[in-house]
Amino acid sequence: MDPDCFAMSSYQFVNSLASCYPQQMNPQQNHPGAGNSSAGGSGGGAGGSGGVVPSGGTNGGQGSAGAATPGANDYFPAAAAYTPNLYPNTPQAHYANQAAYGGQGNPDMVDYTQLQPQRLLLQQQQQQQQQQHAHAAAAVAAQQQQQLAQQQHPQQQQQQQQANISCKYANDPVTPGGSGGGGVSGSNNNNNSANSNNNNSQSLASPQDLSTRDISPKLSPSSVVESVARSLNKGVLGGSLAAAAAAAGLNNNHSGSGVSGGPGNVNVPMHSPGGGDSDSESDSGNEAGSSQNSGNGKKNPPQIYPWMKRVHLGTSTVNANGETKRQRTSYTRYQTLELEKEFHFNRYLTRRRRIEIAHALCLTERQIKIWFQNRRMKWKKEHKMASMNIVPYHMGPYGHPYHQFDIHPSQFAHLSA
């Protein structure tokens, strides 16, 4: 055996053994007419149960071997390297050596260099056929998607979109599941729907994104659904290439007054603020929307209502009589604790320290200043009451809850006598 070809299959090993024993073959069988016939795609010999191959039996080879002349050889033709009556129903007939039984080479040697190229050629041909089928099926699926998208009614699209609007990564309502012909085209159709979903995710936010950059609160829910459905349809109509172009078109359209729909759709304005909007609301809306407009072009910010804004501590309110009354500032327990600790060390604050505390506790300098003024007044009151009761100073600046050193008049009775 050739040491360079030690990695071979069991069929190839049997092939080499069969070529070494040509005398075991049946010399009475002669096939003058059936040497070249091939079985199309079966690949196996059609030997009978009794070991005799009829004259019409075929060896499923490649059909590339030369025809064996009736008088030249009494053995099997060059398309078979071993007898089918010894090894029936074996799909290895195309691994035959043409020189083994044609009388042109040594019958004891098998040319293994002819085995691998044929198998590689078969694999390459199968891969090319599969790729051609896949491309054809993808083209058919794209045409079917285009026709279905044009024929479907906008109301049906709106209803299906309302069913899928809760999940932003749901399948496209226009894309059918298995409209392609055969298994290959069905899988390609699913791949196309996955590609369209990936492209449409540019116009849709992630499930955790709670921003309202694409939805204006002044639009009704039906108009919002229509605008989202139109953006989806743009991505589905032209396949993966048209989806990217539609996403770019959406970015350009958002810079105008509204979103331009598909063919036959009406432009819907995204935001039209009324005359009663205050300047503070529009300013805060611009600040909120500036961080969300990256990559989507310039869009009008969403409406910000007064109840959305945080009410600052200490703001003045107007009562029923029209009088302005400042609300009582309520401090949290953490803020009170930090202020008490600071007052324990410093009863008077510098402006630098007051600014630091205001930033740390999310309060204003005015609130810090007023709190320390009130706390100093409270401390003076407690200190004055403690001095009247002759409480020692080592009890601390806050006084003491139980006054064990209270003065009783009977203590000075002996002085008056």
UniProtKB/Swiss-Prot annotation:
Residue stretches of biased makeup (Gly residues): 38-64
Keyword Transmembrane: no
Residues covered by region (Disordered): 24-67, 169-220, 256-304
Major subcellular location class: nucleus
Chain positions of motif Antp-type hexapeptide: 303-308
Modified residues (Phosphoserine): 216
DNA-binding segment(s): 324-383
GO annotations of cellular component type: nucleoplasm; nucleus
Subcellular location: Nucleus
Pfam families: Homeodomain (PF00046)
Molecular functions (GO terms): DNA-binding transcription factor activity, RNA polymerase II-specific; protein homodimerization activity; RNA polymerase II cis-regulatory region sequence-specific DNA binding; RNA polymerase II transcription regulatory region sequence-specific DNA binding; sequence-specific DNA binding
Record key words, sorted: Developmental protein, DNA-binding, Homeobox, Nucleus, Phosphoprotein
Alphabetical list of CDD domains matching this protein: homeodomain
Gene Ontology BP, a term: positive regulation of transcription by RNA polymerase II
Bias (Low complexity): 186-203
Summary of the tissues where the protein is detected: In embryo, expressed in the labial and anterior prothoracic segments and the extreme posterior of the maxillary segment. In adult, expressed in the maxillary analgen of the eye and antennal imaginal disk and the labial and T1 leg imaginal disks.
UniProt key word Lipid metabolism: no
Reported function: Sequence-specific transcription factor which is part of a developmental regulatory system that provides cells with specific positional identities on the anterior-posterior axis. Controls the segmental transformation of the first to the second thoracic segment (prothorax to mesothorax) and of the labial palps into maxillary palps. In embryo, required for fusion of labial lobes and development of the T1 denticle belt. In adult, expression in the head is necessary for proper development of the labium.
UniProt family annotation: Belongs to the Antp homeobox family. Deformed subfamily.
PANTHER family associated with the record: HOMEOTIC PROTEIN DEFORMED, HOMEOTIC PROTEIN SEX COMBS REDUCED
Protein name listed in UniProt: Homeotic protein Sex combs reduced
Name of encoding gene: Scr
